[in-house]
């Protein structure tokens, strides 16, 4: 602990005496006149430079120019219903086609568009199978037949071990 303290004190002491380091920064007085002059210049600049409408300092001049051009274009050109400028003409057309297709084609009960036809069919088959087939005690559909079988086998093994210890 003392070694680290002495070492850090020595490094700071050396930095104080080298030119261009802490000593130079500390010896330059920060004048209040310079600070006030800087603030006055900054306020004059902000008063003289009026920003055009739609200008954002984070996006720059060209972005605001393109926004103004976009508003002129949108006034000149009328879009069809369902058009979105962020998606484009083709996207909105395909969305309309998709809605017409979904109206024409009725899905069977249990169908999910995220899983597909075969998944819903297998889910319906699974429910029919589960109604027809009763599960043995200890069976879990999440673990499978073999797991439950091994659990039942485990209880039989425990019974056999205890009977062998008694004899």
Curated annotation (Swiss-Prot):
This is Kininogen-1. Transmembrane segments: none annotated. Belongs to the bradykinin-related peptide family. Expressed by the skin glands. GO terms for biological process: defense response; vasodilation. Keywords: Amphibian defense peptide, G-protein coupled receptor impairing toxin, Repeat, Secreted, Signal, Toxin, Vasoactive, Vasodilator. It comes from the Eukaryota. It is found in: Secreted. InterPro entries: Bradykinin (IPR009608). It comes from Bombina orientalis. Residues 1-23 form the signal peptide. Its main location: secreted. One of its GO terms (cellular component) is extracellular region. One of its GO terms (molecular function) is hormone activity.
